[in-house]
Design a protein with these regions (language model features):
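Alpha-helical transmembrane signal-anchor/signal-peptide segments
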Residues: 47-70
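Extracytosolic and intramembrane catalytic regions of membrane-associated proteins
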Residues: 95-209, 213, 217-250
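Membrane-embedded alpha-helical segments of integral membrane proteins
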Residues: 1-24
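Transmembrane alpha-helices and immediately adjacent membrane-cytoplasm interface residues
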Residues: 32-53
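Membrane-interfacial entry segments at the cytosolic side of transmembrane helices
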Residues: 24-33
Length: 250
């Protein structure tokens, strides 16, 4: 609509100043049409530069994510690759489903670089039970139908203003590492596997540690159900494995 008004007021300005013979009428109508033209141009500029007629609407979503190491590994793993040396912005590797394949998330889209610079992703380690990703998306939306009718020309409505994603992982049962560190851990695990005696001793140590934790839990919680004991056993196993992986990274 604003483009149509701009064309109309431009034509009116031209016609009134050129084709009207009476000076008083020409000046009056010409001035009015010129002012309307300027007002329309200013409104258009305000909308383009300052999103006049629009407001920011924020939507937040949270869902569970799963280990990049697969569901068979007790400890969870998140791979994080920093984008640049100083920015708190990462490409994060994890699985969207429990039995799903791990894949990179939040990789900048080089084909849509303007939108890409408005997006960021980071992670934090917290005292939580499950790993989640929370995405906060802020978009420019029309204040009402009038502004939409007036300015909606190039699909400005629903345009992205900012998007931030935060992956939160449990501090005890998950490990965050870079892709290079993940390869380092894999090499160490492969080297340990070539020594059956060492591998068996490590496994026995792990089992003993889990058993000790479970026994302590049952002593502190004598009325715990079988499911609660099972859940705690899984958590204790994940915690000890995560500790072992963190030790490998030191």
């Amino acid at each position: 609509m604003v483009i149509i008004l701009l064309v109309i007021f431009t034509l009116l300005t031209f016609i009134t100043w050129i084709n009207i013979d009476k000076a008083a009428l020409r000046i009056t109508t010409g001035t009015i049409s010129l002012l309307l033209l300027l007002a329309t141009a200013i409104l258009m500029a305000f909308n383009f530069n300052n999103h006049y007629g629009m407001e920011k609407v924020t939507k937040t979503t949270t869902h569970e994510i799963y280990s990049a190491g697969g569901s068979k590994m007790p400890a969870g793993m998140l791979m994080a690759q920093a984008l640049g040396s100083k920015s708190d912005n990462y490409v994060l590797v994890y699985a969207d489903k429990e039995d799903g394949k791990a894949k990179p998330h939040f990789t900048p889209d080089q084909k849509h670089i303007i939108e890409a610079v408005k997006k960021s992703a980071t992670y934090k380690v917290a005292d939580v039970d499950k790993a989640t990703v929370t995405t906060k998306t802020t978009r420019w939306e029309w204040r009402n139908d009038f502004f939409k009718l007036l300015f909606a020309v190039g699909g400005e409505g629903h345009s992205l203003a900012k998007q931030t994603s935060v992956v939160t992982v449990p501090k005890d049962t998950w490990v965050v590492m870079t892709p290079a560190q993940a390869k380092q851990v894999q090499k160490q695990q492969a080297a340990a596997a070539t020594d059956p005696a060492a591998a068996q001793a490590q496994q026995a140590q792990m089992q003993a540690g889990v058993q000790a934790k479970v026994q302590a839990f049952m002593q502190d919680n004598p009325n715990a159900s079988a499911q609660e004991v099972k859940d705690y056993t899984a958590k204790a196993t994940a915690t000890l494995m995560a500790d072992a992986m963190k030790t490998m990274l030191k």
